[in-house]
A protein has these predicted regions:
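Transmembrane beta-barrel architecture of outer-membrane proteins
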Residues: 2, 46-54, 87-89, 126-132, ...
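C-terminal beta-signal and adjacent terminal beta-strands/loops
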Residues: 20-22, 60, 109-116, 126, ...
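Residue-level "hotspot" positions that anchor or transmit function at local structural transition points
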Residues: 43-45, 82, 121, 125, ...
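Gram-negative outer-membrane beta-barrel transporters
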Residues: 10-22, 30-32, 37-116, 136, ...
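Short beta-strand-to-turn element immediately C-terminal to the catalytic PLP-Schiff-base lysine
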Residues: 4-6
């Protein structure tokens, strides 16, 4: 169920969700049988319940966007939090437009989560900052420069899973209009 407001240069969305799932396939380390490796397994009954807020606006030449999510990802059989699912997550973005140049920043923040079904291995929350610049030099051609994880943050979405450090991208894009 959701509500939406569009007006006066503002877009706001509020959504409540309640999903009951049967035979949900999830991943965990170690496996429920105790073997110390990551494996997929079945959760008989699960509930994903929560609330999402999102909004966007433009202030002069700056576009602003934000989203916040709160959820209770629950294994209904055990009553525990589902593995590798944070209860809180947020995204914030701003970009500045000046003619054919657009530059921006994105911040992603994720709360802590458990790496395993018994909820004994907690993974820390994290925040990542990304920066980008796009130059549209013709209607069809643009150049993109991007840096993800600017602070070179070490973080885990799964125990001992190698996530990217600081990453640089450059791309030339052609789009048929």
């Amino acid at each position: 169920m959701g509500l939406r407001y569009d007006g006066n240069g503002y877009n706001l969305d509020a959504t409540y969700f309640h999903n009951r799932l049967t035979d949900m396939i999830v991943s965990s380390t170690p496996c429920p049988d105790g073997v110390n490796r990551s494996c997929a397994y079945n959760v008989n009954e699960a509930t994903l319940e929560g609330f999402s807020l999102a909004g966007s606006t433009r202030l002069m030449d700056v576009n602003l966007r934000a989203s916040l999510d709160w959820q209770d990802p629950r294994d209904d059989t055990t009553g525990r939090q589902l593995a590798r699912r944070a209860k809180k997550h947020a995204n914030f973005a701003a970009d500045y437009v000046m003619g054919q140049l657009k530059s921006g920043a994105e911040l992603t923040v994720s709360g802590d989560r458990f790496d395993n079904a018994p909820n004994t291995n907690r993974l820390a929350g994290y925040g990542l900052l990304n920066l980008y610049t796009t130059y549209q030099f013709t209607p069809d051609w643009s150049l993109l420069l991007r840096v993800n994880n600017v602070a070179d943050k070490n973080y885990e979405v799964a125990r001992n899973y190698g996530t990217s450090g600081r990453t640089w991208f450059a791309s030339l894009r052609y789009g048929i209009r």
